[in-house]
């Protein structure tokens, strides 16, 4: 292993946590996405309810 390579085993958890996030995009959950998500959960709950309550 050359001098420039970094062994992943010697990187501590505090170094990983303290690194700044390079992706600064804002996570958005608007009303349409919320409705689609709730509809998906509801449809999946109806479909799998026969297996759960059998």
Curated annotation (Swiss-Prot):
Pfam families membership: PsbL (PF02419)
Keyword Transmembrane: yes
An annotated GO BP: photosynthesis
Coiled coil: none
Gene Ontology cellular component list: chloroplast thylakoid membrane; photosystem II reaction center
Membrane topology: Single-pass membrane protein
Location, primary (coarse class): plastid
Key word Chloroplast present: yes
Keyword terms of this UniProt record: Chloroplast, Membrane, Photosynthesis, Photosystem II, Plastid, Reaction center, Thylakoid, Transmembrane, Transmembrane helix
Subcellular location: Plastid, Chloroplast thylakoid membrane
Transmembrane segments: 33-53
Quaternary structure and interacting proteins, as annotated: PSII is composed of 1 copy each of membrane proteins PsbA, PsbB, PsbC, PsbD, PsbE, PsbF, PsbH, PsbI, PsbJ, PsbK, PsbL, PsbM, PsbT, PsbX, PsbY, PsbZ, Psb30/Ycf12, at least 3 peripheral proteins of the oxygen-evolving complex and a large number of cofactors. It forms dimeric complexes.
Function: One of the components of the core complex of photosystem II (PSII). PSII is a light-driven water:plastoquinone oxidoreductase that uses light energy to abstract electrons from H(2)O, generating O(2) and a proton gradient subsequently used for ATP formation. It consists of a core antenna complex that captures photons, and an electron transfer chain that converts photonic excitation into a charge separation. This subunit is found at the monomer-monomer interface and is required for correct PSII assembly and/or dimerization.
Protein family membership: Belongs to the PsbL family.
Name of the protein this chain belongs to: Photosystem II reaction center protein L
Annotated organism of origin: Stigeoclonium helveticum (Green alga)
Encoding gene per record: psbL
